[in-house]
Swiss-Prot record:
InterPro entries: GPP34-like, GPP34-like_sf. Belongs to the GOLPH3/VPS74 family. Phosphatidylinositol-4-phosphate-binding protein that may play a role in the process of vesicle budding at the Golgi and anterograde transport to the plasma membrane. Residues 171-182 are annotated as: Beta-hairpin required for oligomerization. Signal peptide: none annotated. GO terms for molecular function: phosphatidylinositol-4-phosphate binding. The keyword Membrane applies. Residues 10-32 have a biased composition (Basic and acidic residues). Its main location: Golgi. This is Golgi phosphoprotein 3-like B. A 1,2-diacyl-sn-glycero-3-phospho-(1D-myo-inositol 4-phosphate) binds at W62, R71, R152, R155. One of its GO terms (cellular component) is Golgi cisterna.
Amino acid sequence: MTTLIRRGRRAEEGQERRADSEDSIKDKDEEDSADSKEIRLTLMEEVLLLGLKDKEGYTSFWNDCISSGLRGGILIELFLRGRVVLEPATIRKKRLTDKKVLLKSDKLTGDVLLDETIKHMKATEPAETVQSWIELLTGETWNPFKLQYQLRNVRERIAKNLVEKGILTTEKQNFLLFDMTTHPVTNTTEKQRLVKKLQESLLEKWVNDPHRMDKRTLALLVLAHSSDVLENAFSSLSDEKYDMAMIRSKELLDLEPDTEGTKPNACEMIWAVLSAFNKS
């Protein structure tokens, strides 16, 4: 009799454990499902989204930094996807701005801007530095033979990707003497998620060590600053939190790239891009 009772209890305990296990699996599936609903954006798309005026659908006419910032985003995105690396340091080439960008893999990504850049790099001999590539992709070169490397209509092509992902829409607006295609934000939830991520990285989730930060978040902070759109992400903050976010972002961006780029777990390309913008 006692044996039967024990077996019955074991059976009940086993059922409870299975039920708990099934609940935990269900919870994990729900979390995965929630994660899968998040739209995957490239760094270039995130920078442009931060720079766009929500209702007007265009970037500030006074912003002359975003073009080069988007090109820097292309280089970091290629690095994070394993397509490019920086050449190893030598006695003569210790500084990040002196290192050449080497093509690690010419496998295409499916993103037109990234793939166009891969093709340019594959056809370039000798290799170029990070700063040179930013200038070439922007078209800021005095060498007429290298104008072919300029990426054209970059903002419009990135905006088109965001339209396809359901974040922007396309409209025509009349500006006195000309019509302009604009891309107002329709998915404000996605932009708010992006803004919240940047705010939290400098406030609630501040780690005071760039090498412990998520690499894509660190890259976005660098690119948003270089593109002069970082303050856009802080406009909704209270004065106290705004000041704190600005102080911490300045501390982060004032770090010496050549020193940070050699530390363990450092993402060299992020610091190389920051160094290139500091130098320009």
